């Protein structure tokens, strides 16, 4: 039986001795839809300013095509973000409503929080968003504003607190999370944020698929679970190798109104890349050869 036959609609993986043992799937467990790759920040830890692909907001027809296929395959989780600030998409709330109407169980957004005005916060809550994670790099005002230019520390804190208040008043089940990369200890402000949100995590710095660091990582490399679990569609319909492929350096296919997620997911290039990972030959894939994520 081939890898693409007789699969369930979900992907599963387990770790055995530091190596991923995969049960593959005929459809991804998570589909990441980049509705826009525009961003209003110039963060020092992000290569967005190095991106050469055009800034595009996804066509509504393509978006609905993707969501409809996810619904047909009972894909339970869609992320409405990738390499941009999703709140720059003025149709975001309408897209959330459409996806929820099609039966998508979990919709997530990753945002820098700068555009979370009262109006947008209410709109996200009312549309039925299930989870929002705010990227909040820097424990102090000075560290934050040095990294996340030109965003303002106090404004983001205020926006997060107001979103939580609006969520609570509406009786919404929206999860509000904060993700932080910092070299400093937690400040009083960070501890207060940690108290009011539903989850607070300190993440590890990575090198964007080897794009920002020339030095090869050291240690034991593992197969990358993303290839068996997550599918990333860029705003122009191209399918990136993973969410770290910010400049579409390794395109696995393109979704159009006559091409499906499943066509690409079970296609020749995806299968080839997975085989290289299973055989510990990631170095033959330029994007993977220096990526630090496979060492975590």
Q: Where are the model-predicted features located?
A:
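Conserved alpha-helical substructure of the radical SAM core
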Residues: 2-131, 142, 150, 154, ...
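Generic structural signal for small/hydrophobic residues in well-ordered secondary structure
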Residues: 35, 39-40, 59, 85, ...
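Short, cysteine/histidine-rich loop/knuckle motifs that typically chelate Zn2+
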Residues: 45, 226, 290
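Short, acidic, Ser/Thr-enriched surface-loop or helix-capping motifs
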Residues: 233-234
